[in-house]
Amino acid sequence: MGKVKKKRGNTFNYNVDRKKLKRKARKKHAPRIPCEPIRSAWNDGKSVAKNLADMGLAANPNKSLPIRPSQVKDAEEQPGKVIKKPYVLEGLQALASLPSKQTMGISSDMIQYVRHMVENYGEDYKAMARDEKNYYQDTPKQIQRKVNLYKRHHPQDYQALVASRIMQ
């Protein structure tokens, strides 16, 4: 009884796109840094820890802020870390001090929808629910919530809308 012939070496896999794999590996190896101050000061020749140390940032927060209180050493024993790139810290602080954008907005379609409903019906939500523009068949309560959302985000526009309706 003979042996089964042994398969030797690796065979080429035709189902894998090598070009795509190489591109993905390159992206993973050198990720895009979204923060502009850090990206401008980044040195590809240095490691992550050294780059961050030059900027005055901590690569490992557990080492920079230990959980257990360690014994207090003399100030002479602890060498002061020199920050080689202080402009990075200043840039990050400037970015952090900027006001954040509102994440929840109202789409232009919803603004148009609410304006149409308020112009035609005022505060009559039951009539709004029967309107032909109510494509999604919102209930009166759902329409009221949308109108209230519009009131919160655009109070001046809503007041002008109601005032123009009263004038008619």
Swiss-Prot record:
Residues 20-40, 59-79 are annotated as: Disordered. The gene is nop16. This is Nucleolar protein 16. The keyword Nucleus applies. It is found in: Nucleus, Nucleolus. Signal peptide: none annotated. PANTHER family: HSPC111 PROTEIN-RELATED, NUCLEOLAR PROTEIN 16. Its main location: nucleus. Keywords: Nucleus. Residues 20-31 have a biased composition (Basic residues). It comes from Xenopus tropicalis (Western clawed frog). The keyword Membrane does not apply. GO terms for cellular component: nucleolus. Belongs to the NOP16 family. It comes from the Eukaryota. It holds the Pfam family Nop16.
